[in-house]
Swiss-Prot record:
Homodimer. The lineage of its organism: Bacteria, Pseudomonadati, Pseudomonadota, Alphaproteobacteria, Rickettsiales. It catalyses: tRNA(Trp) + L-tryptophan + ATP = L-tryptophyl-tRNA(Trp) + AMP + diphosphate + H(+). CDD domains: TrpRS_core. It comes from Rickettsia felis (strain ATCC VR-1525 / URRWXCal2). Pfam families: tRNA-synt_1b. L-tryptophan binds at D134. This is Tryptophan--tRNA ligase. Keywords: Aminoacyl-tRNA synthetase, ATP-binding, Cytoplasm, Ligase, Nucleotide-binding, Protein biosynthesis. Belongs to the class-I aminoacyl-tRNA synthetase family. Catalyzes the attachment of tryptophan to tRNA(Trp). A motif ('HIGH' region) lies at residues 11-19. GO terms for cellular component: cytoplasm. It is found in: Cytoplasm. Its EC number is 6.1.1.2.
C-alpha cells in the first residue's frame, strides 16, 4: 500500500523559483511513488488582508502552476482547501485541545504580525492549528516542507498526540517531516539572508515562474553578490553568491565543485549570464503551459471540483471518527 503524502502552497501572489525548487518539483517526482494530496491553501491566504479578485486569481494561478510543472490530476489529488469544509471543522476540534502556550511560541506569528500583535487577526494566530488539520485530516505519512515550517510540523505531531492520548486510541496518524537538502530554501536575490518570498516588496528579489526571458536576465544581472570578484561557496561569509550557486546546481544538477571550477577565471558576469539561461531553459516550458492553462478557466475549475470531491471522502472519514470520540452524534 502506498504511503500518503500531503503538502500545499498558500494561494497568495505569484509562485516563484523558490516555490518550484523547494516544493513543486519534488512533488512531481513523488507522484509516481506515493498517494499524494496537494492543495491550494486559500483559507490560510485570508489571514492577511487580500482583495477578493486577488484571491480568486491566485487560486487559479497556483493551480495552473501545479499542472504546468507536471502534477498529473489523474495520479494525485489536487484541490482548494476551502472546497473541503472538513478542514475548518477539524481545525475547530483541534483548537479545543491545543494549549494557548503552544501557539504563543510559534515564531512565524511574531514575524507576520509585526510589532503590533494586538491588531493581528485570530486566524493568523491559530494558523498552525488549521495547518495541523490540513495534514492530520488525510492521515498523511509524509509531509514535505521547508525548514521554516518545521516548527509547525512539530506542533502538528504534538496535537495528534494530545488527541490520541485523550481518547487512548490512535485516531490521528503522527506524520513524518521530510525536508530536502538542496533547493529547499532559495534565498532572496537582494538579500542572501532572507528567504525568497512572494510578499517581498521588491519584485527583483525573486524569479517569478511567469517572468519572461528578458526580465529573468535583468533580475539575475542585478542580483546582489559582494565585493569579491571570484565565484566561491560559503553561506556564512558569502550568502548571496552561495544562493546563486544553489540555484545553479539545483537546476543543472551539476556538483558545486564542477560549477566553481568552470568559472574560476571568468568572474560574475559570465556566471550570471549562464545562470539566467539555465533558469530560462527550465522555466520556459512551465511558463508557456501556465499561460495556456490560464486561458481555460473551465478546465481549471473542473480539476478543483474533481479533486475536492475525492479529498472529501478521506477527510469526512477522519472528521467523523474524531467527532465520534468527542461524543458528537454522527
Amino acid at each position: 500500500m502506498k504511503k500518503t503524502v500531503l503538502s500545499g502552497v498558500q494561494a497568495t501572489g505569484s509562485l516563484h523559483l523558490g516555490n518550484y525548487l523547494g516544493s513543486i518539483r519534488n512533488w512531481v517526482k513523488m507522484q509516481e511513488e506515493y498517494n499524494c494530496f496537494f492543495f491550494l491553501a486559500d483559507l490560510h491566504a485570508i489571514t492577511v488582508d487580500i482583495k477578493p479578485s486577488e484571491l480568486n486569481n491566485s487560486i487559479m494561478g497556483v493551480l495552473a502552476v501545479y499542472l504546468a510543472a507536471g502534477l498529473n490530476p489523474d495520479k494525485v489529488t489536487i484541490f482548494a482547501q476551502s472546497m473541503v469544509k472538513e478542514h475548518a471543522e477539524l481545525a475547530w476540534l483541534l483548537n479545543c485541545v491545543t494549549p494557548l502556550g503552544w501557539l504563543k511560541r510559534m515564531t512565524q506569528f511574531k514575524d507576520k504580525a509585526g510589532s503590533d500583535q494586538e491588531k493581528a487577526c485570530l486566524g493568523l494566530f491559530s494558523y498552525p492549528v488549521l495547518m495541523a488539520a490540513d495534514i492530520l485530516i488525510y492521515k498523511a505519512d509524509i509531509v514535505p516542507v521547508g525548514e521554516d515550517q518545521k516548527q509547525h510540523l512539530e506542533l502538528t505531531r504534538d496535537i495528534a498526540g494530545v488527541i490520541n492520548r485523550r481518547f487512548d486510541k490512535e485516531i490521528l496518524k503522527v506524520p513524518e517531516v521530510l525536508i530536502s537538502e538542496t533547493g529547499t530554501r532559495i534565498m532572496s536575490l537582494r538579500d542572501g539572508l532572507k528567504k525568497m518570498s512572494k510578499s517581498d516588496i521588491s519584485d527583483f528579489s525573486r524569479i517569478n515562474l511567469k517572468d519572461d526571458n528578458d526580465l529573468i536576465h535583468q533580475k539575475i544581472k542585478k542580483a546582489k553578490t559582494d565585493h569579491l570578484s571570484f565565484v566561491s561557496y560559503d553561506k556564512e561569509t558569502r550568502p548571496e553568491i552561495s544562493n546563486l550557486l544553489d540555484i545553479y546546481r539545483s537546476l543543472s544538477e551539476e556538483s558545486l565543485e564542477k560549477i566553481i571550477n568552470n568559472y574560476q577565471n571568468q568572474g560574475f558576469s559570465k556566471f550570471k549570464e549562464d545562470l539566467a539561461e539555465i533558469i530560462i531553459t527550465n522555466l520556459q516550458p512551465i511558463r508557456d503551459k501556465y499561460l495556456e492553462l490560464m486561458n481555460d478557466k473551465e478546465y481549471l475549475l473542473k480539476i478543483l471540483h474533481k479533486g475536492a470531491e475525492k479529498a472529501r471522502i478521506r477527510a469526512s472519514e477522519t472528521v467523523n471518527e474524531v467527532k465520534e470520540q468527542f461524543g458528537f452524534v454522527i
